[in-house]
Amino acid sequence: MECIVLTQKEKDRLVTHAVEQQPNESCAMLLGEKIDDVWNIKEVFLTENIDESQTNFTISPDELLKGYKLAEKMHLELVGVFHSHPNSDAIPSSTDKKFMQNNPVPWIIF
């Protein structure tokens, strides 16, 4: 059984980011390492939703590059994607499902 591990501090950062970005969706890259069936989140890289949308999110190519460079510098990898659904249930939308196929890491939807 696989699981995701993150600290309360990182969880609080994600919740705060989601609240601050309302009414739009928020998003972040989750950096860490996978050991056996455990995805350990060591760093949350908060990103801007360039769509400025309540129903979609896009992370800019520049921010994606910054996130990957930070992961490399810290000897980590992308282990998850976070985004919020401020006006709907926290279940994957059809768009989410499509992009999950391109990014086969755990997705956390809040």
Model-derived features: where do they sit?
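Conserved beta-strand-loop surface patch within small alpha/beta domains used
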Residues: 1-78, 87-110
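Short, well-ordered beta-to-alpha junction loops that form the rim of enzyme active sites
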Residues: 84
